């Protein structure tokens, strides 16, 4: 097993472990690839291993998704929840399409920017986690439509490298009155259309740089991401209900500081 295969597996595990927690999976994968010197198809590899995480959450929530969609014709609550997720997804579609090129040109995915945003996001998450002690919404399926739309706009901050999609949506939900469990759960549901849409778009944009030589490493990364994400999705809700998001906030800060020190040392 060569170096690239081992690193592909490690990056897949890292993607799966971090995709649904508020620490920025993309930031972690890009930083790990940078420091490990991974010779991969770059963005194409990152996009395709994210599909493993997407499949994991679809698998874990398959039963609940079936219940929601099958009952929607008769159940106003199910219809309202589907509409809430679609409303929250809408800002990412509009802003992503209109501003994608500008964002890519202005906000380069450099290790320094990612590290700084990890620290900033960690401080914000720590503050919000400690102040969110009077929730008004306790079920992701009952979030009001205006609240869902606001979460969708906040999610767009994740277009800045290192911010974290799940981190932005969780912080947004907490600020708008969700309890810690329902904030994470709504982030899960919102990730499905958001990540699928981003996957299709990025796959199309990167179709010319995929090659057969990289297929083996991509498959390994995909499988590792899927398995790790299943574990995280199954355990995260119970964890945050009991302990909150403080651990993830301090992790972001620690990783960001460590990366800045490493870069300063010339790594």
Curated annotation (Swiss-Prot):
UniProt subcellular location: Cell inner membrane
InterPro entries: UppP
Molecular function GO terms recorded: undecaprenyl-diphosphatase activity
Key words, A-Z: Antibiotic resistance, Cell inner membrane, Cell membrane, Cell shape, Cell wall biogenesis/degradation, Hydrolase, Membrane, Peptidoglycan synthesis, Transmembrane, Transmembrane helix
EC number(s) given by UniProt: 3.6.1.27
Annotated transmembrane regions: 5-25, 45-65, 82-102, 108-128, 143-163, 183-203, 213-233, 243-263
Primary localisation category: membrane
Any one GO biological process: cell wall organization
GO cellular component, one term: plasma membrane
Pfam families: BacA (PF02673)
Reaction it catalyzes: di-trans,octa-cis-undecaprenyl diphosphate + H2O = di-trans,octa-cis-undecaprenyl phosphate + phosphate + H(+)
Family: Belongs to the UppP family.
Protein name as it appears in the record: Undecaprenyl-diphosphatase
Organism in which the protein naturally occurs: Paracoccus denitrificans (strain Pd 1222)
Organism taxonomic ancestry: Bacteria, Pseudomonadati, Pseudomonadota, Alphaproteobacteria, Rhodobacterales
Gene behind the chain: uppP
